[in-house]
Amino acid sequence: MAAERYTFGMEFLSCDPSTGETVYTRPGWSVDRLQQAISRLRQHQHAWRGRPIDERVARIRRLGELIEANVDRLAPVITLEVGKLIHEARAELEKTARLCHYYADLAPTLLLPQTIPTSASRSGVSFEPLGLVFAVMPWNYPVWQALRFAVPALAAGNGCLLKPAPTVPQSTALLLELMQEAGIPVFDVAWIDVDAVEAAIAGCDAVAFTGSTRTGRLIASLAGKHIKKTVLELGGSNPVLILRDADLATAAQECAMSRFRDAGQSCNAAKRLIVVPEIADDFLQAFMAEVTRLTPGDPRQPGTTLAPLHRADLRDQLHDQVTDACRHGARCLSGGQVPDGPGFYYPATVLDHVSPACRIYHEEAFGPAASILHAENEADAVRLANDTPFGLGAAVYSQDLPRAERLARDIEAGSVFINRHTSSDLRLPFGGVKASGYGRELSEFGLYEFVNVKTFWQR
């Protein structure tokens, strides 16, 4: 199907990526219905913010329990709509349930007013909800990303209006059902297309967006026009520095897992593998051994280790990047061809000697294609890591920890992992710099994004 159908159509549509067949459709909303939903949410939010924090988090904890109890029901739907491996869909849901429990435990303490000594008899800050948070979320983690923004916002007393990707309506509808069963009346789904996004932004008090940098610029522009607090989690082209004293077996295994998990469709995946001369050949050999073990196939089957891409246009875009790289001097060590047959499959592709002449050097590669960059030395490796418009995450593999930490401080990224692939941890803030966005999700920092930190001062 044409990309425009997914992006601009008022119809929400599930298409099985493993076959290319349409399996479900639902109509979108009118702007009038959107305005009615916003008005209804505002009424509920006024009551929700007045509830004791212990009651709010009890319902969030109940949501986590419901997700845990419904993994077997939800995971196949995510696999059907997104195309991800069934065990990866289950892992997404299990992590989301832990998110609910984490904030249910944390929020009551973090949202207590804080006393700050000044010349006043009493002064400090309180944490109050902003109101309604409107979120535009992508398709690749339809439950995790929806709740990564919503759970802390709800705990703080906000209401949440979610615009899901138009290709995951069934996953989203099931999430809404669990929200209602948990007794959370201040979460709703806006079944709208992009033409109605500005109306939603204007009607709400803050905006959260996860997706491409290009769309993020549009969201930021609309939010700025209406002076709305915004958190943007955008694209990434995460570098991984493999230094001369790295544990190559571990680095190769984890780089392959990070790059090809979820068919490479993660903003936080390892995408640019930067090697120094001393270990380049040995690392490549170990990495290719991991890549050749990947088995494409039906994502529902336990033996499959490489899933299809989500849409045909995403596969076309990735293949164009790979073809361009080969045309500009990169060596294709594996993959690089669109396979025959149904579905949106693309083979695990490794491009060696990717240079600045290649589009994939500068652009985010959202699929199973790894770029190998050759650095002259460690300083050059850091230069290559920073030679990108993105700044989401990065990793450094070295057994010399002080040196690895020193290099990590020079990398322009929202997070740097040493001797581990980039990932997100509930207890740590997640977000980027540069064209990867601003604001943070997860941890206490994610909780404070959508509150009014109100100063109080008493004579």
Stretch-by-stretch model annotation:
Residues 183, 214-355, 418:
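ALDH superfamily catalytic-core signature
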Residues 19-25, 241, 295, 327, ...:
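Conserved C-terminal structural/oligomerization subdomain of aldehyde/semialdehyde dehydrogenase
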Residues 45, 49, 64-67, 71, ...:
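Structural signal for hydrophobic packing residues in well-ordered secondary-structure cores
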Residues 1-121:
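N-terminal Rossmann-like NAD(P)+-binding subdomain of aldehyde/semialdehyde dehydrogenases
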Residues 114-250, 375:
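Rossmann-like NAD(P) dinucleotide-binding subdomain of oxidoreductase/dehydrogenase enzymes
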Residues 20, 56, 78, 100, ...:
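Residue-level signal for inorganic ion chemistry
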Residues 159-161, 332, 415:
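A short hydrophobic/small-residue beta-strand
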Residues 22-29, 44-50, 135, 240-243, ...:
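Short, well-ordered beta-strand elements within core beta-sheets of diverse protein domains
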